[in-house]
Amino acid sequence: MKYYLEKKETVLRDVHSSADGLSAQEAQRRLDENGRNRLSAPPGKPLILRFFEQMADPMIIILLIAAAISGVLAVVEGESFADVVIILTVVLINAILGVYQESKAEKAIEALQEMSAASSRVLRGGKLVTVPSEELVVGDIVLLEAGDAVPADGRLIQSASLKIEEAALTGESVPVSKFIQLLELGEAKDIPLGDRRNMVYMGSTVAYGRGSAVITATGMDTEMGKIADALSRAEDGQTPLQIKLSQLSKILTWLVLGVCALVFAVQLMRSGRMDFEVVLNSFMIAVSLAVAAIPEGLAAVVTVVLSIGVTNMSKRNAIIRRLTAVETLGCAQVICSDKTGTLTQNKMTVVDHFGDDEKKLAAAMALCSDAEVNAAGDVTGEPTEAALVAWAWKLGLDKNTLKARYIRCCEAPFDSARKLMSTVHLTEDGCIQYTKGAPDVLLSKCTSYVENGRVLPMTAAYRERVEQANKAMAARALRVLACAERRWDAKPVSDEPEFLERELCFTGLCGMIDPVRPEVAAAIKECREAGIRPIMITGDHIDTAAAIARELGILTDGTYAVTGAQLSQLSDEEFSEVFKNISVYARVQPEHKTRIVNAWRAAGYVTAMTGDGVNDAPSIKSADIGVGMGITGTDVTKSAADMVLADDNFATIVAAVEEGRRIYDNIRKCIQFLLGSNMSEVISIFAATLMGFTILQPVHLLWINLVTDCFPALALGMEKAEPDIMKRRPRDAKAGIFAGGMGVDVIYQGLVVSGLVLLSYFVGHFMETGTWMLTDSAHGTTMAFLTMSMAEIFHSFNMRSQRGSIFALPSSNMALLISAAASLAATTVVCEVPALAAAFDFTGVSFREYAAAILIGAFVIPIVELVKAAQRLAARSRASETETD
C-alpha cells in the first residue's frame, strides 16, 4: 500500500493500530515475528581471504609457477633456493601492499546503522514510553520534535509546523514542510520520495516543529533499507588499468610458454640426443627464458607507484580509499555530481531584496524567526530562517540585541497550510507585529505599504511592482519570502492567525538561494577543457537546478534538464537515445541516479559520481569511481566511495584528475621500461641459445629485474606531469596497454639493448680467451650482466618521455638520478663482494672492463634519441599531410 495516498485512518487500520499505539504485548509479538528495526549487513571478508585474493592476479600466478619450477630444479640439482626466495619475497611484498591499501572493510551498512536514532518516544497502550529504536515495529506511534532523528518510515498523523531535513535522502537543501493530508496522484504514476509531504523516513532529521507518525516500515523495508540493499548488491567492476594489466599478463603468459617451448625444442635438436641430462639442461635454459620474459617487479612497481599517487592526492585533499581509483580518474570522461553541498555550499543565503529599507527589512525578518546567532556570528536553526539571521548579521544587526530591545510577546507559528508566520514584539509605544511568508499569500493580506519611510495605501500599480520583483527573483531560482508589519497600541487580545494576519503593511521581499561554491565554475571550465562532461543530479526542484547549472556552465546550448518523474516514463531504449543530451536531472530518487550512471557506463564512458547524501551511495558504488564528500558527506557515502574529498571542494576533483593522468602516464613509462628490459633479456638468451652458449643464468635475470630495473622504474613513477596534460582529451579506456606505438618501442628498444649485451659478451669472452669462439664464458657472462645493468640504467633516462628528447625536458627527476646511482652501486657490490660474486658465478672485473661495459651500455641513449627524432619527424609529416588534405 502507498500510505501517502491514503487517509491516516486508513493507514492505522491497515497496520492494525490506533491513535493510542500498540499494546506492549502486541509490540513484542511483532518484534519477535518481524525482527529488529535495523539494517542487515553482509559478513566482511576475512583478512586472510583478502590476502589470497591478491594472488589471483595472472602476473602473480605466473611468478608462483616460476617459483615452483625453480624450487623443483633446486631440489633435483641440489642447488640453493635463492631464486625461489627472491620470487616469493616479491609476491609477498606485492600482496602485503595490496592488502594494506585495500583491506579497509566496507563500512557503508554500518554507517547506515549509526545514522539511526538510539531511542525513540512512542505511545504504547496510550502511554508515552521511551524504547530503543531497534525495538520499533510497524504500527507503533512515534512522537517527533526538533532535533530528533526519524527512526523508521512512517505516515504522519499529527503535524504542528513540522519541517524535516531530508537532504541526505533526497538532496533537497531546504527542510520540507510536512502535513497530515493525503496526497493526490494526479496524472503521474507515482509521487517522488521528496514530494511525499505526509511521510517521514528513517535517516532524516526533524528541523522544526513537532508531530507524530504511525510506523509503516522498519529495518530493511524502509527507504534507507532499500538503499542499503542496493549498496550491498552493487558490484565493483575492474578499473581500466586492472583490465589492461590482466590482458598484459595473459599476453605474457602465452608468449612465455611459446618461446620457452621453442627454445626447449631448439636445444633438444641441437643436442641430437634425448637423455635425462640433455632434457634437464634444455629445460633449465627454457626456465631461464621464462624468468627473463616475466617482469617480476612489474606488479610491485605498479602498486608502489599507485601508492605514491595516493600520498600525493592526499596532500591535495583527495583521500583515496581504493588504490586503482588513482588511475581511473585519469580517464574519467563524465562526472555526475550531486548539487547540494557539492556544487553549492548547502547554506541558504540572502542574495537579493526588494523594499524601502534593507536594514529594516532584515531586522524584521530576523525577529520573525526562531534561528539564533552567537557572538562569533555562527547561526543555528532551520536553514531558511538561519539565512535571514545571517543576512541581518552581515548588515550589522545582532539578533540578540534586537530580541532584547523588541521582546516577543506572542506569535502565530508557521503553518504549511497558510504559509505564514507572525510574531508580535513589545515597543515603547505598544507592539509591532512582523509577518513573513509566501509573497502571493502575504500580499493579499496587505492594505498598505512602506515607501521612503511613509506608509501609503496599497495600489494596483505597487502590487504589480511587487509581483514583478517576485517573478524576477523566482526566475533566478531564488526562494522568495515577503515581509509585512502591523502596529498595535497594546498586546493583541488573540494570537490566532485569522486575527493577527490582516490589514498588514507590506515592507519588502528577500530572495535566497543555496549559492554555488566560488571555485566550482572554474573547475567545471577546466573539466570541459580536459574533455570531461559534467552532469548535475539533484533532488532539488528543476528550476533551481537548471538556474545553477546555467550559472556554472553545466547546462549549455543543446542540452536540457529533466525530472525524475520524466525519466521514469522513459524506457531503457528511449533513455539510451537521449541521455547524452541531458545535463541536469532534478527531483530524482536513488534508483534514478544508478540508472543514469549505468547508462553512461554502458555507452563506454568512464564515469565518476560525486555526492554527500545517503541517496548517493548506491550510484557512487556503481560508478567507475565514486567520490564522497569528507565534511558534509555522510559516513555511508564516504564508506562507499573510492575517493573522498577532504575539503568538499569540487575543484579538488580536477586536481585529482590531473594526478590520475600523471600517474597513468608514469605507469606506462614504467611498463615500457620493464617490458623493454625483459624483451632484451629474452632476445639475448634466445640468440645465445641459437648460437650455442649460455649468456645469463636465472639468478642474474632476477637480480636485473628486481634490483637494477625496479629502482629506476619506481623513480619514473615520480615523473612530473607534462605541461599539456589537462588540455588532452581523456584517453580511451578500451585502448590496449601498447597503444600509441608503445609496443613497437618495446620491441626496438629490446633489440637495441640485446645487441649491446651480446656485443659485450663477445668482448668479455675475447678478453678471457683471446678468441671469438662461441662458447660458454664466465667472463663473458660477467660482462653481459654488467652491460645489461648499465644499459638499463641509461635507458631509464630515455623513458622520461616516450617521444620527447631527454635533453629538452624542462626539469630533472632527482629521484631517477638517485635510483640510477643506487642501481649502479648495487651492481658494483654484487660483482665485487667475493661471496656474492661466487654465488652469481662472476669473475673479477678490471677497471678497463667496467669502462667498456659503461661505454657500451651508454650507447642506448644516442640510438634511442635518433629513433625518437625520426618518430617526431614522421609525426610532423603526417600532421602536415592531414592539414593539406
Q: Which residue stretches match the model-derived regions?
A:
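Membrane-interface interhelical connector segments
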Residues: T769-W772
